[in-house]
A protein has these predicted regions:
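Short low-complexity, flexible loop/linker segments enriched in glycine and/or proline
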Residues: 9-12, 147
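Conserved nucleotide- and phosphate/pyrophosphate-binding catalytic cores
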Residues: 95, 101, 113-234
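RNase H catalytic domain
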Residues: 1-8
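Divalent-metal (Mg2+/Mn2+/Ca2+)-assisted nucleotide/phosphate chemistry catalytic cores
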Residues: 11-135
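Short, flexible active-site loop motifs that bind/organize anionic cofactors or intermediates
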Residues: 4, 105, 155
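Generic signal for short, ordered secondary-structure residues
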Residues: 4, 71-72, 148, 167
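Poly-acidic low-complexity segments
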Residues: 1, 35, 40-43, 157, ...
Length: 234
Protein backbone atom coordinates (compact mmCIF):
# COMPACT_ATOMS: atom_id res chain seq x y z
CA UNK A 1 0.00 0.00 0.00
CA UNK A 2 2.71 2.53 0.92
CA UNK A 3 4.53 1.97 -2.37
CA UNK A 4 1.40 3.22 -4.12
CA UNK A 5 1.57 6.48 -2.16
CA UNK A 6 5.24 6.91 -3.08
CA UNK A 7 4.17 6.70 -6.73
CA UNK A 8 1.45 9.36 -6.45
CA UNK A 9 -1.57 7.23 -5.51
CA UNK A 10 -3.80 9.42 -3.29
CA UNK A 11 -3.60 8.44 0.38
CA UNK A 12 -7.36 8.04 0.60
CA UNK A 13 -7.31 5.38 -2.12
CA UNK A 14 -4.56 3.15 -0.67
CA UNK A 15 -6.77 0.83 1.38
CA UNK A 16 -9.26 0.38 -1.46
CA UNK A 17 -6.38 -0.28 -3.85
CA UNK A 18 -4.98 -2.93 -1.52
CA UNK A 19 -8.35 -4.68 -1.18
CA UNK A 20 -8.89 -4.56 -4.95
CA UNK A 21 -5.62 -6.30 -5.80
CA UNK A 22 -6.04 -8.77 -2.94
CA UNK A 23 -9.36 -9.80 -4.48
CA UNK A 24 -8.35 -9.74 -8.14
CA UNK A 25 -4.89 -11.35 -8.15
CA UNK A 26 -6.06 -14.78 -6.88
CA UNK A 27 -8.75 -14.78 -9.58
CA UNK A 28 -6.11 -14.14 -12.25
CA UNK A 29 -4.09 -17.12 -11.06
CA UNK A 30 -7.16 -19.34 -10.82
CA UNK A 31 -8.20 -18.39 -14.36
CA UNK A 32 -5.02 -20.00 -15.71
CA UNK A 33 -5.21 -23.05 -13.48
CA UNK A 34 -2.82 -22.05 -10.69
CA UNK A 35 -3.40 -23.55 -7.24
CA UNK A 36 -3.71 -20.56 -4.89
CA UNK A 37 -3.85 -22.62 -1.70
CA UNK A 38 -0.45 -21.36 -0.54
CA UNK A 39 -0.83 -17.80 -1.87
CA UNK A 40 -0.27 -15.26 0.91
CA UNK A 41 -0.60 -11.47 0.85
CA UNK A 42 1.51 -9.26 3.11
CA UNK A 43 0.44 -5.63 3.45
CA UNK A 44 3.43 -3.30 3.19
CA UNK A 45 2.46 -1.02 6.06
CA UNK A 46 2.22 -4.03 8.40
CA UNK A 47 6.02 -4.27 8.46
CA UNK A 48 7.29 -1.07 6.82
CA UNK A 49 6.15 1.08 9.76
CA UNK A 50 8.30 -0.78 12.29
CA UNK A 51 11.35 0.88 13.86
CA UNK A 52 13.94 -1.55 12.51
CA UNK A 53 12.65 -1.18 8.95
CA UNK A 54 12.74 2.61 9.16
CA UNK A 55 16.26 2.48 10.59
CA UNK A 56 17.31 0.37 7.60
CA UNK A 57 15.75 2.90 5.22
CA UNK A 58 17.99 5.57 6.77
CA UNK A 59 21.00 3.27 6.76
CA UNK A 60 20.39 2.29 3.13
CA UNK A 61 20.24 5.98 2.17
CA UNK A 62 23.82 6.48 3.41
CA UNK A 63 25.12 4.03 0.78
CA UNK A 64 23.41 5.60 -2.25
CA UNK A 65 23.22 8.97 -3.97
CA UNK A 66 20.20 10.91 -5.22
CA UNK A 67 21.27 10.00 -8.75
CA UNK A 68 21.45 6.30 -7.83
CA UNK A 69 17.85 6.42 -6.62
CA UNK A 70 16.68 8.46 -9.59
CA UNK A 71 18.25 5.98 -12.01
CA UNK A 72 16.83 2.96 -10.17
CA UNK A 73 13.30 4.38 -10.13
CA UNK A 74 13.32 5.96 -13.59
CA UNK A 75 11.28 3.29 -15.41
CA UNK A 76 8.87 2.53 -12.57
CA UNK A 77 8.04 5.77 -10.76
CA UNK A 78 6.58 8.91 -12.32
CA UNK A 79 9.49 11.25 -11.57
CA UNK A 80 9.19 14.16 -14.01
CA UNK A 81 11.60 17.10 -14.19
CA UNK A 82 11.25 17.95 -10.51
CA UNK A 83 10.69 14.62 -8.74
CA UNK A 84 9.22 14.35 -5.27
CA UNK A 85 11.42 12.83 -2.59
CA UNK A 86 8.87 9.99 -2.30
CA UNK A 87 9.81 8.67 -5.73
CA UNK A 88 13.47 8.46 -4.72
CA UNK A 89 12.61 6.57 -1.52
CA UNK A 90 10.63 4.02 -3.55
CA UNK A 91 13.60 1.91 -4.79
CA UNK A 92 15.14 1.89 -1.30
CA UNK A 93 11.98 0.40 0.20
CA UNK A 94 11.45 -2.06 -2.64
CA UNK A 95 15.00 -3.31 -2.11
CA UNK A 96 14.56 -3.67 1.65
CA UNK A 97 11.29 -5.52 1.16
CA UNK A 98 13.31 -8.47 -0.15
CA UNK A 99 14.94 -8.84 3.26
CA UNK A 100 11.90 -8.10 5.40
CA UNK A 101 9.65 -10.44 3.43
CA UNK A 102 12.41 -13.07 3.61
CA UNK A 103 12.01 -13.90 -0.07
CA UNK A 104 14.26 -16.09 -2.19
CA UNK A 105 13.22 -14.47 -5.47
CA UNK A 106 11.87 -11.09 -6.55
CA UNK A 107 9.83 -11.14 -9.74
CA UNK A 108 8.98 -8.19 -11.98
CA UNK A 109 8.70 -6.92 -15.52
CA UNK A 110 11.72 -5.69 -17.46
CA UNK A 111 10.83 -2.14 -16.42
CA UNK A 112 11.93 -3.16 -12.90
CA UNK A 113 15.46 -4.18 -13.93
CA UNK A 114 17.19 -1.07 -12.57
CA UNK A 115 15.58 -1.46 -9.15
CA UNK A 116 16.42 -5.16 -9.10
CA UNK A 117 20.07 -4.44 -9.89
CA UNK A 118 20.00 -1.64 -7.29
CA UNK A 119 18.82 -4.14 -4.65
CA UNK A 120 21.47 -6.72 -5.53
CA UNK A 121 24.25 -4.13 -5.36
CA UNK A 122 23.28 -2.38 -2.13
CA UNK A 123 21.70 -5.00 0.16
CA UNK A 124 25.07 -6.72 0.82
CA UNK A 125 26.39 -3.37 2.10
CA UNK A 126 23.81 -3.62 4.89
CA UNK A 127 24.81 -7.21 5.61
CA UNK A 128 21.87 -8.74 3.74
CA UNK A 129 22.17 -11.38 1.04
CA UNK A 130 21.33 -10.51 -2.58
CA UNK A 131 18.27 -12.31 -3.94
CA UNK A 132 17.53 -13.97 -7.25
CA UNK A 133 15.85 -11.47 -9.57
CA UNK A 134 13.56 -12.72 -12.34
CA UNK A 135 12.10 -10.52 -15.07
CA UNK A 136 9.60 -11.11 -17.83
CA UNK A 137 8.94 -8.94 -20.91
CA UNK A 138 6.30 -6.24 -20.88
CA UNK A 139 3.56 -6.43 -23.48
CA UNK A 140 3.42 -3.30 -25.69
CA UNK A 141 0.22 -1.30 -25.74
CA UNK A 142 -2.51 -2.05 -28.26
CA UNK A 143 -2.01 1.32 -29.93
CA UNK A 144 1.61 0.85 -30.94
CA UNK A 145 3.38 2.24 -27.88
CA UNK A 146 3.89 1.50 -24.20
CA UNK A 147 0.81 0.26 -22.38
CA UNK A 148 -0.61 3.02 -20.21
CA UNK A 149 -3.07 2.85 -17.33
CA UNK A 150 -4.29 6.32 -18.30
CA UNK A 151 -5.21 5.26 -21.86
CA UNK A 152 -7.89 2.54 -21.77
CA UNK A 153 -7.46 1.82 -25.49
CA UNK A 154 -3.83 0.80 -24.96
CA UNK A 155 -4.54 -2.04 -22.55
CA UNK A 156 -6.84 -4.89 -21.69
CA UNK A 157 -8.15 -4.19 -18.22
CA UNK A 158 -8.77 -6.89 -15.62
CA UNK A 159 -12.41 -5.84 -15.44
CA UNK A 160 -13.03 -5.70 -19.20
CA UNK A 161 -15.89 -7.85 -20.45
CA UNK A 162 -15.39 -10.37 -23.26
CA UNK A 163 -17.04 -7.89 -25.62
CA UNK A 164 -14.62 -5.14 -24.53
CA UNK A 165 -11.60 -7.40 -25.10
CA UNK A 166 -12.79 -8.35 -28.60
CA UNK A 167 -13.45 -4.70 -29.43
CA UNK A 168 -10.03 -3.55 -28.20
CA UNK A 169 -8.15 -6.29 -30.04
CA UNK A 170 -10.19 -5.59 -33.17
CA UNK A 171 -9.18 -1.94 -33.06
CA UNK A 172 -5.55 -2.54 -32.08
CA UNK A 173 -2.62 -1.18 -34.07
CA UNK A 174 -1.15 -4.17 -35.93
CA UNK A 175 1.08 -3.09 -38.81
CA UNK A 176 1.48 -5.88 -41.41
CA UNK A 177 4.93 -7.46 -41.36
CA UNK A 178 6.12 -5.50 -38.31
CA UNK A 179 6.85 -7.30 -35.04
CA UNK A 180 8.31 -4.42 -32.98
CA UNK A 181 5.84 -2.59 -30.71
CA UNK A 182 3.07 -4.91 -31.89
CA UNK A 183 0.82 -5.49 -28.91
CA UNK A 184 -1.28 -8.12 -30.69
CA UNK A 185 1.71 -10.31 -31.51
CA UNK A 186 3.12 -9.87 -28.01
CA UNK A 187 -0.24 -10.90 -26.55
CA UNK A 188 -0.12 -14.02 -28.71
CA UNK A 189 3.48 -14.82 -27.84
CA UNK A 190 3.48 -14.37 -24.09
CA UNK A 191 -0.11 -15.25 -23.20
CA UNK A 192 -2.06 -17.20 -25.80
CA UNK A 193 0.72 -19.52 -26.94
CA UNK A 194 1.89 -20.05 -23.36
CA UNK A 195 -1.58 -21.20 -22.35
CA UNK A 196 -1.89 -23.34 -25.48
CA UNK A 197 1.45 -25.00 -24.76
CA UNK A 198 0.51 -25.69 -21.13
CA UNK A 199 -2.73 -27.31 -22.31
CA UNK A 200 -0.98 -29.16 -25.17
CA UNK A 201 -3.18 -27.37 -27.70
CA UNK A 202 -2.51 -25.75 -31.06
CA UNK A 203 -3.48 -22.23 -32.08
CA UNK A 204 -5.95 -21.94 -34.95
CA UNK A 205 -6.05 -18.72 -36.95
CA UNK A 206 -9.50 -18.57 -38.50
CA UNK A 207 -9.66 -17.07 -41.98
CA UNK A 208 -12.20 -16.94 -44.77
CA UNK A 209 -11.55 -19.45 -47.55
CA UNK A 210 -10.92 -16.63 -50.00
CA UNK A 211 -7.90 -15.64 -47.87
CA UNK A 212 -6.54 -19.20 -47.75
CA UNK A 213 -8.67 -20.72 -45.01
CA UNK A 214 -7.71 -21.55 -41.46
CA UNK A 215 -4.07 -21.93 -40.43
CA UNK A 216 -2.89 -24.00 -37.46
CA UNK A 217 0.28 -23.21 -35.48
CA UNK A 218 2.06 -25.36 -32.93
CA UNK A 219 4.36 -22.54 -31.81
CA UNK A 220 4.60 -18.76 -31.92
CA UNK A 221 7.84 -18.70 -33.94
CA UNK A 222 6.14 -20.15 -37.02
CA UNK A 223 3.33 -17.63 -36.76
CA UNK A 224 5.77 -14.73 -36.44
CA UNK A 225 7.72 -15.96 -39.47
CA UNK A 226 4.55 -16.02 -41.57
CA UNK A 227 3.57 -12.59 -40.25
CA UNK A 228 6.91 -11.05 -41.20
CA UNK A 229 6.59 -12.56 -44.68
CA UNK A 230 3.03 -11.20 -44.81
CA UNK A 231 1.56 -14.64 -45.40
CA UNK A 232 -0.86 -13.68 -42.63
CA UNK A 233 -1.89 -10.15 -41.75
CA UNK A 234 -4.67 -8.17 -40.07
Amino acid sequence: DLHGALDNTPWGVLEKRYKYYKAVIPLIFKSIGVNTGKLEFVKGSDFQMKNKYFFDVLKFSTFVSVEDCRKAASEVVKLGDSPKLAGLIYPIMQSLDEEYLNVDVQYGGTDQRKILVFAREVLPKLGYKPRIEIMTPLIPGLIGKKMSASDPKSKIDLLDSEEDVIKKLGGAFCEPGKVEDNGVLAFLRYIIFTIKKDNKEKFVLERDKKFGGNVTYSNYEDLEKDYIQKKIHP
